From Swiss-Prot:
It comes from Helicobacter acinonychis (strain Sheeba). It catalyses: orotidine 5'-phosphate + diphosphate = orotate + 5-phospho-alpha-D-ribose 1-diphosphate. It holds the Pfam family Pribosyltran. Homodimer. This is Orotate phosphoribosyltransferase. It is an enzyme of class 2 (transferase). Belongs to the purine/pyrimidine phosphoribosyltransferase family. PyrE subfamily.
Amino acid sequence: MDVKACYQNAKALLEGHFLLSSGFHSNYYLQSAKVLENPKLAEQLALELAKQIQNARLNIECVCSPAIGGILAGYELARALGVRFIFTERVNGVMALRRGFEVKPNEKILVCEDIITTGKSAMECAKVLEEKGAHIVAFAALANRGICKRTHSSLKAQEDACLPSELPLFALEDFVFDMHEPKHCPLCTTSVAIKPGSRGN
């Protein structure tokens, strides 16, 4: 499946000067919501991702996503895997498990995002679940921005990667774009970074 083409066809691969939720600036932005607004395409992407996870023979009892960006991807992946789905959300800037969601002791949970950049949000989600007694077995995303090490990819983890190296990250594609710390961003000399979504927008 050509994931890049899916993003391009959905006009979800944006070019400009963007502030990512990770804090980095980039000349490209992946707007997964535009891809996932098509239920059939969302289902197909999730089924492809589920195949990787099933081939790894992991025992997964639940999928959890950090709101808001990961919810659609996580729900579709849970459906493809035949397991339940829950999500965490920020309350006054702190990730929390709410809405009556519960975690069983040692419940095997996969954390799913739409896009993984550094993995910071995914780790915040995982920490909340672990504090409730869950056992995190893997991470997943539709696309990986190349900072974290993806299963079946030749790319190595970068210094800013937050995901633990001992757990697998499943994703359909690596999207490797230039990313800059704000104080060293060459794009800032000619324009101001915009934030098209996720946190706080």
